[in-house]
């Protein structure tokens, strides 16, 4: 679908962004949250030593107020300590493990670990607060792919290493987009990348 391709392209372009990491993360979160149409979205930086968290970036849909009255030193919800993605739709609330999500008034939540660090992990939270919602496979897949790109951006910034790792992850995502994509050098016109669909 065209919207998905446009949103994917916008997110992929952030790989080449030289802007401050907070700005890149803000743009990334806005593109993702608007595309899957959630009420609010946050990236939390968990503090390992104090069991508190900071709100690194937050996005709110029009009319929504932040759930948090401060951005640092917030007690961590236990469901944020997840090693793998946690997807809770309205129809699975009430089952074991989702009580805490229900208690804070969320109707549906997706939690994705972004970065593991000794100082504390970075975690994404996407939330439906107003109405019941059942996450679709398309929403989950888009989020998963977007997270992989953000991980590439962060890894690149942290290590300032070669582009090889990022492009491997990017290549994998672009090979699964479902349409042909190629990238050329604006100055020389030389093709820099073509995904598998185009090569076939």
Which residue ranges define each predicted feature?
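Signal-transducing coupling segments at domain and membrane junctions
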Residues: 89-108, 128
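GAF sensory/regulatory domain recognition
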Residues: 30-33, 42-77, 83, 191-192, ...
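Soluble sensory domains of the PAS superfamily and closely related sensory modules
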Residues: 77-86, 92-95
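PAS/LOV and related PAS-like sensory modules
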Residues: 1-45, 145, 152, 163-189
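Short beta-strand-to-loop transition segments that serve as allosteric relay/switch motifs
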Residues: 61, 122-134
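Amphipathic alpha-helical "output/dimerization" segments
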Residues: 134-155
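A short, aliphatic-rich beta-strand micro-motif
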Residues: 107-115
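Short hydrophobic/glycine-rich mini-motifs in sensory/regulatory modules
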Residues: 114-124
């Amino acid at each position: 679908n065209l919207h998905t391709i446009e949103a994917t392209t916008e997110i992929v372009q952030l790989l080449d962004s030289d802007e401050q990491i907070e700005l890149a993360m803000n743009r990334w979160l806005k593109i993702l949250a608007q595309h899957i149409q959630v009420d609010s979205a946050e990236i939390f930086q968990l503090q390992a030593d104090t069991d508190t968290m900071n709100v690194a970036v937050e996005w709110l849909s029009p009319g929504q107020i932040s759930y948090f009255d401060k951005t640092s030193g917030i007690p961590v919800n236990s469901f944020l300590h997840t090693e793998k993605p946690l997807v809770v739709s309205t129809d699975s609330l009430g089952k074991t493990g989702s009580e805490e999500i229900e208690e804070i008034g969320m109707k549906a939540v997706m939690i994705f670990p972004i970065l593991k660090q000794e100082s504390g992990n970075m975690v994404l939270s996407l939330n439906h607060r107003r109405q019941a919602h059942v996450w679709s496979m398309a929403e989950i897949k888009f989020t998963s792919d977007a997270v992989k790109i953000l991980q590439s951006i962060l890894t690149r910034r942290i290590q300032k290493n070669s582009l090889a790792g990022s492009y491997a992850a990017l290549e994998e995502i672009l090979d699964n987009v479902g349409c042909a994509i190629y990238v050329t050098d604006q100055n020389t016109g030389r093709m820099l990348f073509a995904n598998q669909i185009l090569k076939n």
